[in-house]
Amino acid sequence: MISLLCWNARGQSQMTSVPVETRSTLLSIDRSMSPKAGFRLMDPMKTGVVFTNLLATERHMTNQMLLNGSGVCAGDVDRDGLVDLYFTSLDGPNRLYRNRGQWRFEDITLAAGLDCPESDSTACAFADLDGDADLDLLVHTMYRGLRVFQNNGELNFTEKTQTAGMVAAKGGMSLAVADYDLDGDLDIYVTRYRSEAMMDEVQATVRIKTVGSERSVSHFNNRPTTDPDLRNRFYIDQRGGIGEYGEVDTLYRNLGGFAFEAVDWTDGTFLDDQAQPLSAPPQGLGPCRAIS
């Protein structure tokens, strides 16, 4: 039997009292040769997977970044040969469902220590970060950066974020895991967008500075754009409109022992489209095309 995890999103484009929600749906595949072969919807009351990712109307009406949603990851966390499921949530706790076989799942979130309340979680990934043959967990968030959890091997996880060397950055979106430097352990690449946007601030004010033929945003809401949280945030497009860059992504090199270091964008690891080392972190659409 092959299974597929699908998401069915429903949202409103105008102000209503109904929250945006994303529900989990389990489908199984009928591999017989009958004309009815295909996917079959599994009853959540029988599977035990009843997770819903809710987002309050008042939140997404004032911050459209939250409408990008949240992710789910799958992996065998207890090494029993069955794939378990972890769901991330924006307005509520995350959920870990242990696969008990025969399409039955058990919610073991609290016992595992993985509910991550009030984290505004956006993405997740299972990966063996310490090489002990069990799957650890990464949880990306909108406001709290990347959270790292070590699998203790007994259906329990310990958070290692504070000592792991994670960069305190907002706007977390997705992540990927791979051994980019071929040293035998898994490294982490995290992507970011923004945690808030100018378009959600109805009363926002902008001051433009012109030097020669160059125009730039000098102030935002009466604050200079040299302030750390505003630096390199805005640009003037070819039509004269004001755009915003996303937060810079981060590649974390795994040093072992749940210790990571952020790779410098200009140390020669990353190359541009001319195969030359970057001179500054990329902004806009994401990273360069290659890692040497």
Write out the residue ranges for each language-model feature.
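Bacterial N-terminal signal peptides
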Residues: 1-6
